[in-house]
Amino acid sequence: MTPEEIAALPYRPCVGVVLMNGDGFVFVGQRMDQNTDAWQMPQGGVDEDEDPFEAALRELWEETGVTADLVEMVAETDGWLPYDLPHDLVPRIWKGRYRGQEQKWYLFRFLGRDDQIDLETGHPEFSRWKWQDPDRLVAEIVPFKRDVYERVVAAFAPHLG
């Protein structure tokens, strides 16, 4: 695909979840489908006619096993935060239909225990997880998502740590 063709593609609507524990650390999972040391927070597409908040709760459950009764919403981003995929990935991800994603992010306080996080879900996305200091989070994220993660951490900074 040419850069012009990629620029004409839409963004995929997506939600992201910052899951914060009582110590102010955030959940990150190591992706199963990457050969690199790629970490990220739970995120995923918004289904057609799905409310973004409900999509965030669904993605959190699908990726971590954490149910809605174990979280409390603290904040959400004002708008949608876009990022572009590297051009070489566009034809391979989402069958070349999107140039990247635009994400609505939610900050949830985790009310449960660590043993209630279960990566062995129907479609596992993470091989392992950890609680990470928000100040050190961005450095572990794949480079093309770092700008969005910086904006998310900045947006939620008053509530983190």
Curated annotation (Swiss-Prot):
Domain spans labelled Nudix hydrolase: 10-154
Pfam families linked: NUDIX (PF00293)
GO biological process: nucleoside phosphate metabolic process; ribose phosphate metabolic process
Record key words, sorted: Hydrolase
Cofactors named for this entry: a divalent metal cation
Residue numbers covered by motif Nudix box: 44-65
Record-level Gene Ontology MF annotations: bis(5'-adenosyl)-pentaphosphatase activity; guanosine-3',5'-bis(diphosphate) 3'-diphosphatase activity
InterPro entries the UniProt entry points to: Nudix_hydrolase, NUDIX_hydrolase-like_dom_sf, NUDIX_hydrolase_CS, NUDIX_hydrolase_dom, RppH
Top-level EC class: hydrolase
Xref: SUPFAM superfamilies: Nudix
EC number per UniProt: 3.6.1.-
Domain of life: Bacteria
Function: Accelerates the degradation of transcripts by removing pyrophosphate from the 5'-end of triphosphorylated RNA, leading to a more labile monophosphorylated state that can stimulate subsequent ribonuclease cleavage.
HAMAP family named in the record: Nudix_RppH (MF_00298)
PANTHER family per the UniProt record, alphabetical: NUDIX HYDROLASE 26, CHLOROPLASTIC (PTHR11839:SF22), UDP/ADP-SUGAR PYROPHOSPHATASE (PTHR11839)
Family of the protein in this entry: Belongs to the Nudix hydrolase family. RppH subfamily.
UniProt-recorded name of the protein: RNA pyrophosphohydrolase
Organism whose genome encodes this protein: Ruegeria pomeroyi (strain ATCC 700808 / DSM 15171 / DSS-3) (Silicibacter pomeroyi)
Gene: rppH
